[in-house]
């Protein structure tokens, strides 16, 4: 499934609905679906909010597939080059009020997904996520 989005916060709800419909139509297990929803919400929010320094429009393409026993999510965008997985992990030992802002969501993405990858290709950021499916899933 391929979905094209604008970098507008109003696009989050349709993107999440598309993921939920995809999960239901492929009978994906609840754990994989929830992990994918969290990861997609975080990454799309970051792309929409921070993807352009000039606040201009850029397109976002989301692709969903089930392959080799895993859910694959690929998100590409024409924003500024940025690898979210290069961000340092948050210091979880510090009290909340002493932590640096940001980075919590990417930390969750890394922990909830089984694989994550970033590349800059053809002037686009490309993030690929994989979540292994329960053995009874397609």
Residue ranges and their predicted role:
Residues 73-101:
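Glycine-rich/acidic phosphate-handling loop/turn and adjacent ATP-lid/helix
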Residues 19-41, 98-100:
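Conserved short strand/loop->alpha-helix "switch" segment adjacent to the catalytic nucleotide/phosphoryl-transfer site
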Residues 58-65:
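A conserved short beta-strand within the histidine kinase catalytic ATPase domain
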Residues 47-52:
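Short helix-loop "hinge" at the ATP-lid/N-box region of the Bergerat-fold HATPase_c
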Residues 65-73:
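Short beta-strand-loop-beta element adjacent to the nucleotide/active-site pocket used for signaling
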Residues 1-3, 7-9, 110-138:
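Flexible, glycine-/charge-rich segments associated with ATP-binding catalytic modules
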Residues 98-113:
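Glycine-rich phosphate-binding loop
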